């Protein structure tokens, strides 16, 4: 009897073990459709619905405006192809971080993680959630601005929801991304089809003399590109989750080749649709371009526009959280952040500590009043690191010849993108110099202080503080260090 019970328990243990993954690490659960959804869902946020006037205000004419939108899509595609070579050559998650590490060593990689994790990505997450909150609140406060406390509480709730979803399951996070990407493509399709119908009916007067009065100075064109490329930001998001892509050698470049041209086509056609209904002056005066379009074309069903803009923003926020959590995870794994941030949930197999940390920092940024100016001043730092990363691709063509390159782009593409990155970093400083850009550079360089204190020299007192914190957090969240996946 006892032998039978013992045998049964052993069989049960084997059955349980057979259902567990071989290693406690991030699993390859994302396919091509999820990859395309992350690219499209992260790039298309609230910008194209709310404020495409930023490009028009610098070009001051319809023709150059549409050309800029198309050119920005081409540049985003070229940049993403450079990242595709990097992502298939160095198949680690974390976006620019592992590429900077391989090309230049730990210091540039640490400065990237420092700037991205403390300011750039959390503020973007917070702004997207605040935008979502304002659109959800708007129908309940017709004729007046909703109270800030309501907006901020709802934004914090959105951050909590998205962080929870992505901490619970990789698959659940990708399902949420797929659903909201589908929802935003529905409203994009409605706007495009409505605009093309109006265009076919002869509403073309706003396209007559479309280059008249164009502002073609170097400063104006550079700022137009700067604003347009900001709307395309997110083209590199798939490189943050390379380790979770099934067959990354195929799916990474394919998702880029499909996803970014799809976004480019949507952006151009949506702008065409806007101009069939509004003159350039009316578009510049509109507070929310898509809402104005809806009021003029979709009435009495115009209420669907703010609803789907809310879906769009929450989808962009989910994509940002999904990918940025992996950057914290990889930085923690390399010892550039608290070690516990690189740990994996035993039950969920997600980088839960990294996602929770990211959500907390983003929530802190909601507390102050207006942080849009902060994001604007730090946005040029993104192109600084894009440029450094793509330059690293050129450097590794000479220093890391032994690395396998399933995808190899012509060298002219990374050279061109490096020069464009330099231009985009310097253009706003030269055209409109302010002290804030200097403060931004000083903040990035201040990361060196933390690097030498806590990473390079690893003082004993710092280890004594971090070890008990790591141990208690590990027990609280049921997380363990990631294991190497045996080949």
From Swiss-Prot:
UniProt effect for mutating residue 333 to Q: In CSNU; decreased amino acid transport activity
Matches recorded under InterPro entries: AA/rel_permease1 (IPR002293), AminoAcid_Transporter (IPR050598)
Cytoplasmic side: 1-31, 85-110, 239-251, 326-351, 392-410, 451-487
Effect of residue 386 to A: Loss of amino acid transport activity
Effect of residue 224 to V: In CSNU; non-classic type I
Keyword Transport: yes
Effect listed in the UniProt record for changing residue 331 to V: In CSNU; non-classic type I
Region named Disordered: 1-22
Molecular function terms, GO-annotated: antiporter activity; broad specificity neutral L-amino acid:basic L-amino acid antiporter activity; L-cystine transmembrane transporter activity; neutral L-amino acid transmembrane transporter activity; peptide antigen binding; protein heterodimerization activity
Effect of residue 379 to A: Markedly reduces amino acid transport activity
Effect of residue 482 to A/G/S/V: No effect on amino acid transport activity
GO biological process: amino acid transmembrane transport; L-cystine transport; neutral amino acid transport; protein-containing complex assembly
Recorded catalytic activity of this chain's protein: L-leucine(out) + L-arginine(in) = L-leucine(in) + L-arginine(out); L-histidine(out) + L-arginine(in) = L-histidine(in) + L-arginine(out); L-arginine(in) + L-phenylalanine(out) = L-arginine(out) + L-phenylalanine(in); L-cysteine(out) + L-arginine(in) = L-cysteine(in) + L-arginine(out)
UniProt feature, compositional bias: Basic and acidic residues: 1-15
Intracellular or extracellular location(s): Apical cell membrane; Cell membrane
Spans through the membrane: 32-55, 63-84, 111-137, 148-169, 170-193, 218-238, 252-274, 303-325, 352-370, 371-391, 411-431, 435-450
Stretches assigned to the Extracellular side: 56-62, 138-147, 194-217, 275-302, 432-434
Amino acids binding L-arginine: 43-47, 233
Tissue: Expressed in the brush border membrane in the kidney (at protein level). Kidney, small intestine, liver and placenta.
UniProt keyword list: Amino-acid transport, Cell membrane, Cystinuria, Disease variant, Disulfide bond, Membrane, Phosphoprotein, Transmembrane, Transmembrane helix, Transport
Outcome recorded upon mutating residue 286 to F: In CSNU; uncertain significance
GO cellular component, one term: apical plasma membrane
PANTHER family reported in the protein's UniProt record: AMINO ACID TRANSPORTER, B(0,+)-TYPE AMINO ACID TRANSPORTER 1
Function: Associates with SLC3A1 to form a functional transporter complex that mediates the electrogenic exchange between cationic amino acids and neutral amino acids, with a stoichiometry of 1:1. Has system b(0,+)-like activity with high affinity for extracellular cationic amino acids and L-cystine and lower affinity for intracellular neutral amino acids. Substrate exchange is driven by high concentration of intracellular neutral amino acids and the intracellular reduction of L-cystine to L-cysteine.
Subunit note: Disulfide-linked heterodimer composed of the catalytic light chain subunit SLC7A9 and the heavy chain subunit SLC3A1. The heterodimer is the minimal functional unit. Assembles in heterotetramers (dimers of heterodimers) and higher order oligomers; the oligomerization is mediated by SLC3A1 likely to prevent degradation and facilitate heteromer trafficking to the plasma membrane. Interacts with CAV1.
Name of this protein: b(0,+)-type amino acid transporter 1
Organism: Homo sapiens (Human)
Upper lineage: Eukaryota, Metazoa, Chordata, Craniata, Vertebrata
